[in-house]
Amino acid sequence: MLMTEPKYIDVDGVLTRYFDAGKGPPLVLFHGGNLGSGNLAECAVDWELNFLGLSKNFRVLAVDKLGQGYTENPLSDDKYTMSGTVEHAYGFLRALKLERPNIVGH
């Protein structure tokens, strides 16, 4: 297995899937992809080759972005924007009470 079992958290009313493993400084991984893409290749599992290796030194979290993978779609169409995606990402960090996380994206 290259990832842990998925977890889900409510982020401002949007059910959000993520993976969480390891101990240490938080390292949050955000995948690439287009807003609202139905392609499951654009999800947190993009990080599967790096995830467990990184968890040896960090608490590593990989999250499905807003409207991608198994994270729900935005609550309104006006959130299908980059700012809506960033708001959701920040909401994810707040919901998990992550202070000063390291962030990686592609």
Model-derived regions, located:
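N-terminal cap/lid segment of alpha/beta-hydrolase-fold proteins
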Residues: 1-15
